[in-house]
A protein has these predicted regions:
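Short loop/turn motifs that connect adjacent beta-strands in outer-membrane beta-barrel proteins
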Residues: 39-48, 100-106, 155-161, 204-208
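Residues that define the transmembrane beta-barrel architecture of outer-membrane proteins
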Residues: 44-50, 85-89, 140-144, 160, ...
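Membrane-spanning beta-strand positions in outer-membrane beta-barrel proteins
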Residues: 49-51, 105-107, 149, 159-163, ...
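Short glycine/proline- and aromatic-enriched beta-strand/turn motifs that initiate or cap beta-hairpins
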Residues: 16-85, 250
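Flexible, solvent-exposed loop segments that connect beta-strands
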Residues: 64-82, 117-139, 175-188, 224-236
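Residues on the lipid-exposed face of transmembrane beta-strands in outer-membrane beta-barrel proteins
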Residues: 37-41, 52-56, 89-97, 112-114, ...
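Predominantly the C-terminal beta-signal and adjacent terminal strand-loop region
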Residues: 190-192, 197-250
């Protein structure tokens, strides 16, 4: 809330003096059909554009089973793992820098933020004294994310513009919580790096720009923290896959 208030206070004086460009639609006979106001007409002239975002997400682990699991399954026993799609939420700030003159389609975006999520894996035991028993392992984390992204945007059409975005996102687990350590024995590494790409839409309003953006993230590192327990021994690697809807305000 304080960040949003600060953004409005920063933008207020400039927007009070902004110039708007009006587009007039006329019929073949010259009659006026309507007038379209171009909001924030001087927006491209800004070299640096700050903002904030809130982003609901859904994530799951991409799982590779271990050789020990394959050997156990061949002997009629073992534990099978299945990742569950889990919701999350991210909040943060936006720093957007223009790369070139006012007409360049390229922008560099740095968007540090925090992500809160609890990821889960279901383990099904077979032939180990608890046939077909399902145990769920949960890993709750608060992550500091530092994405560095390249944005390629189309020409503006009145008050809308589409864009593509992609880059690299380092991620660091600030906290990692296990509600019941006797049950939740699975742990993951605290650092990760992800490949990100997506598409978005810029919508220009009189006092701000709103940009819904759909972004996909794929972890490049194996974040499994190997421990000597039944759950870790059945896994070879864990990688993060996430789909996030960013709601950007600049």
């Amino acid at each position: 809330v304080l960040a949003l208030l600060g953004l409005v206070l920063w933008a207020g004086p400039a927007l009070a003096q902004r110039k708007r460009s009006d587009a007039i639609d006329r019929s073949r006979k010259g009659h006026i059909k309507g007038i379209t106001v171009e909001n924030l007409s001087n927006y491209n002239q800004r070299f640096f554009r700050p903002g904030i975002y809130i982003a609901p997400s859904f994530s799951r682990f991409f799982i590779e089973q271990s050789d020990a699991y394959i050997s156990a399954i061949q002997q009629g026993r073992g534990i099978a793992a299945n990742s569950i799609i889990s919701p999350g939420l991210a909040i943060g700030f936006i720093g957007d820098i223009r790369l070139g003159n006012v007409n360049t389609p390229f922008h560099l975006r740095f968007a540090p933020g925090l992500r809160f999520e609890t990821r889960s894996i279901e383990f099904t035991g077979r032939g180990v004294g608890m046939p077909d028993t399902i145990r769920t392992q949960e890993v709750a984390t608060t992550q500091l994310e530092l994405p560095l992204l390249l944005k390629y945007q189309s020409n503006r059409r009145r008050n809308t513009r589409v864009y593509m975005i992609g880059g690299i996102k380092p991620s660091f687990a600030v906290t990692q919580r296990q509600n019941n350590q006797a049950i939740n024995q699975l742990t993951i590494n605290r650092t990760d790096i992800l490949l990100e790409y997506g598409v978005g839409l810029d919508l220009f309003y009189p006092y701000f720009k709103f940009g819904p953006e759909l972004r996909f993230s794929h972890g490049l590192r194996n974040i499994l923290d190997p421990r000597n327990n039944t759950y870790s021994n059945s896994l070879q690697s864990l990688r993060t896959n996430t789909v996030t809807l960013y709601l950007n305000i600049e």
